[in-house]
Regions:
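Redox- and metal-dependent alpha/beta enzyme cores, enriched for Fe-S-associated oxidoreductases
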Residues: 214-253
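Extreme N-terminal starter segment of soluble prokaryotic enzymes
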Residues: 2-6
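Active-site glycine-rich loop that binds ribose-phosphate moieties when present
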Residues: 173-193
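C-terminal functional extensions of proteins
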Residues: 243-327, 335-340
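An anion/phosphate-binding loop that grips the pyrophosphate of nucleotide cofactors and donors
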Residues: 196
Length: 340
């Protein structure tokens, strides 16, 4: 099968690397990335979109290859000067090159441009070869409910503070996507789902990346109705995360940290879930009812391995949905609904 239009739901590092492999595997296909913006934050008066920037820098050749985020050849003069002034926060590193992106973004947002247009303008410099769409133009921020170490009372902190400052050490009790109820899909997102030959869930965090994207009203329904097959790639390999903090997030929703656990959490599209097919790592076993499961090498250890993973994902997308999606307006029993 020749794929004309492929849509990918992506978070940061894992999603960016998967997209790079996909671009290599199918250079002639139209690729659209719907990127999580729940990690976005305003610091020092600047609007920062970590996942969008990681995808843009990775595909544009400007990423720091060692860290997997931020700019290559970065310097930290402004960060040092801010620290010398005692300007908080000091725990979030903004490099000098990276600051230029945030300055341009913030200036355009302040001038009234929506995030989708701002992202397109920024991407025009980087030429990523992939259409980059934020999940929404509205402001949505993930907050984490934790216990105050001093009082034991519950408090909510921004996801970036929980992850970057505290390294996800305070046990998360809940994740709250502030603003998501009032959000709408960004222009082009629902249309991309409607025209897709395949929709791929990158090996991104199921809770705070993929789950946040599909929390935007209308996007889960758009995914259910897409004419192409929906294939997910497990972010869990041999019972552990490859990168990130999914192992700290999944238990909050009562999801087992395993390829099977995440697959069941996503569920079968034929039963109101997300998946037609699910890729797990070679040697991992997963029983996901009504979902075709394939075991292939998942580690994106080189450009060649990543492109091979992308091709395996597309192989699983051939043949149309495993079972027809439910009729419009139907839904399965609430007790069986995956809780993103």
């Amino acid at each position: 099968m020749s794929f004309v239009h492929i849509v990918v739901l992506a978070g940061g590092v894992g999603g960016a690397r998967f997209l790079a492999g996909l671009r290599s595997a199918v250079p002639d296909a139209r690729l659209t990335a719907v990127v999580n913006t729940g990690d976005d934050v305003t610091l020092h008066g600047l609007r920062i979109c970590p996942d969008l920037d990681t995808v843009m820098y990775t595909l544009g050749g400007g990423i720091d290859p060692e860290r997997g985020w931020g700019r290559a050849g970065e310097s930290w003069t402004v960060r040092a000067e801010l620290a010398a002034y005692g300007a908080e926060p000091t725990w979030f590193g903004l490099g000098d090159r990276d600051l230029a992106t945030h300055l341009v973004r913030t200036r355009m947002l302040d001038a009234g441009y929506p995030l989708s247009q701002v992202t397109a303008a920024l991407a025009d410099r980087w030429q990523p070869g992939v259409e980059l769409l934020p999940m929404t133009d509205q402001r949505v921020e993930t907050h984490v409910v934790v216990a105050d170490p001093a009082t034991g009372r519950q408090q909510a902190v921004h996801f970036q503070e929980w992850w970057v400052r505290h390294r996800a050490e305070p046990e998360a009790r809940a994740f709250v996507q502030v603003g998501v109820d009032a959000a709408k899909p960004a222009p082009g997102v629902a249309e991309a789902f409607a025209a897709a030959d395949a929709v791929l869930l990158a090996p991104s965090n199921p809770v705070v990346s993929v789950g946040t994207i599909l929390g935007v009203p209308g996007l889960r329904e758009a995914l259910l109705a897409t004419p192409g097959r929906v294939v997910g790639v497990s972010p869990i390999v041999s019972g552990a995360v490859v990168r990130g903090m999914a192992d700290r997030c999944l238990p909050v929703l009562g999801v087992e940290v395993s390829a099977e656990g995440v697959g069941r959490h996503y569920g079968a599209r034929s039963a109101g879930g997300l998946l037609d097919a699910w890729l797990v790592h070679t040697g991992d076993a997963a029983d996901v009812p009504a979902v075709a499961v394939r075991a292939v090498p998942l580690l994106m250890s080189s450009p060649e391995a990543t492109a091979a993973l992308a091709r395996a994902t597309l192989d699983a997308a051939v043949g149309g949905p495993l079972c027809p999606p439910p009729l419009a307006g139907s839904r399965r029993d609430p007790e069986e609904r995956p809780d993103d």
